[in-house]
């Protein structure tokens, strides 16, 4: 079973497309900047998994810039 589950993640960000975009951007940032992350520990070793864990923990949110 995958952690965190897609159902739990969609409670934080309502669109699966937005979820993928946010996770990919965060994972890329973590990789390029050698960022260790904002959580004390992670279950995943991969950057995308860490980004999804941050979303699940509420540390990473989507900001809408509707103008």
From Swiss-Prot:
NCBIfam families: rpoZ. GO terms for biological process: DNA-templated transcription initiation. The RNAP catalytic core consists of 2 alpha, 1 beta, 1 beta' and 1 omega subunit. When a sigma factor is associated with the core the holoenzyme is formed, which can initiate transcription. Keywords: DNA-directed RNA polymerase, Nucleotidyltransferase, Transcription, Transferase. PANTHER family: DNA-DIRECTED RNA POLYMERASE SUBUNIT OMEGA (PTHR34476:SF1). GO terms for molecular function: bacterial-type RNA polymerase core enzyme binding; DNA binding; DNA-directed RNA polymerase activity. It is an enzyme of class 2 (transferase). It comes from the Bacteria. InterPro entries: DNA-dir_RNA_pol_omega, Pol_omega/Rpo6/RPB6, RPB6/omega-like_sf. Transmembrane segments: none annotated. The keyword Transcription applies. Its EC number is 2.7.7.6. Promotes RNA polymerase assembly. Latches the N- and C-terminal regions of the beta' subunit thereby facilitating its interaction with the beta and alpha subunits. This is DNA-directed RNA polymerase subunit omega. It catalyses: RNA(n) + a ribonucleoside 5'-triphosphate = RNA(n+1) + diphosphate. Belongs to the RNA polymerase subunit omega family. It comes from Listeria monocytogenes serovar 1/2a (strain ATCC BAA-679 / EGD-e). GO terms for cellular component: cytosolic DNA-directed RNA polymerase complex.
